UniProtKB/Swiss-Prot annotation:
Family: Belongs to the FAD-binding oxidoreductase/transferase type 4 family.
Keywords for the protein's UniProt record, in alphabetical order: FAD, Flavoprotein, Oxidoreductase
Gene name per UniProt: ygcU
Domain FAD-binding PCMH-type: 47-226
GO molecular function terms attached to this record: alkylglycerone-phosphate synthase activity; FAD binding; oxidoreductase activity
Protein known as: Uncharacterized FAD-linked oxidoreductase YgcU
Amino acid sequence: MSLSRAAIVDQLKEIVGADRVITDETVLKKNSIDRFRKFPDIHGIYTLPIPAAVVKLGSTEQVSRVLNFMNAHKINGVPRTGASATEGGLETVVENSVVLDGSAMNQIINIDIENMQATAQCGVPLEVLENALREKGYTTGHSPQSKPLAQMGGLVATRSIGQFSTLYGAIEDMVVGLEAVLADGTVTRIKNVPRRAAGPDIRHIIIGNEGALCYITEVTVKIFKFTPENNLFYGYILEDMKTGFNILREIMVEGYRPSIARLYDAEDGTQHFTHFADGKCVLIFMAEGNPRIAKATGEGIAEIVARYPQCQRVDSKLIETWFNNLNWGPDKVAAERVQILKTGNMGFTTEVSGCWSCIHEIYESVINRIRTEFPHADDITMLGGHSSHSYQNGTNMYFVYDYNVVNCKPEEEIDKYHNPLNKIICEETIRLGGSMVHHHGIGKHRVHWSKLEHGSAWALLEGLKKQFDPNGIMNTGTIYPIEK
């Protein structure tokens, strides 16, 4: 027999103390969603089941005890730290869920210069860790636009990526070891070593699990020397995306690793570079690190781009100014909310990836299908995209779309606009051989395509859920679709 809402709250207070169990209605409503539902949130409308409580966890031991209790009574838990998620992964879709807030677990445990790694609890803000490292002349190399908001546990749980990934890699390339708590309360640690061949890499059971398998409590990541004085900026305008993708490919294949390598189409580029884009596509690069490496990287990029006469160089100071204003902190989020409430104009992104052979077709097919098939295409005020993370064998594509919310209630905006646009992007990307999600995580709104995304490999993911969360208490509806 399931526990009542009141009984759940009482038991949680017994486990962690009354001061750590929040039942204020305003807090509960805010914790029932993430930024995927920012339009109804701005209008004060919350339609999902409100959680029974938000638990402010203070230690791994508390996480263990709380999960043990919840597992015994089959209570759904939603792990949460910085709450910068954008894909619905933090939504509470089950009645009487409990939000497991790890933001109070915010200690930097160790900065180990000799072994070039740093260990932090799940609630340490990335910006706090980064600033502590920069004071010593080092960096994580991880710099998502959410850096002022995001915390370490969520960054690892969502398999996040930073703006300098083409040089430093994504979060999975940075994580050395970690600690996590399984659904039954068992604490597991993966030790910090540079590499091993002792079976499959079990870090990857935890990295990217989105709270659907376990709760990440501590992470150790690599660190790198921080030398911003060596940064070199390059910018170009060009006529078409196909040429831009070809240039990105040549740079990667020839072995150059700029920290930033971005290609904007004309519509998306106009949003950021009105002062010089002139309605054209935009290529941006930054080289950094050891001065000799940065210089060689910059020279290599310039040489490759010079093979394409249509590309026109722009003043590097313009690119540096853009670079210095990239991140989204609390002030930008607050300003966006005011603007949305005032204008009714929404902006979202959906990021995918593909090999070099299919990425341009993905881009063109998605844009064309949205313009010709989406029934509310006339409400779209901007539709474009950019590539911002490249690899030896391919790149990502960020589809960026703004639309006016017309003739619908705030709570209807998602199903009228956002979900149908996501559907087109996911369907076209999978059809053409790409991945429907590059770095935001599946969350609860791309979960409909999880099985199609993985194909015959879905059995492996399904096996992990059965093994590590047999009672299905971990973030129901994320990664794994709810079976009806």
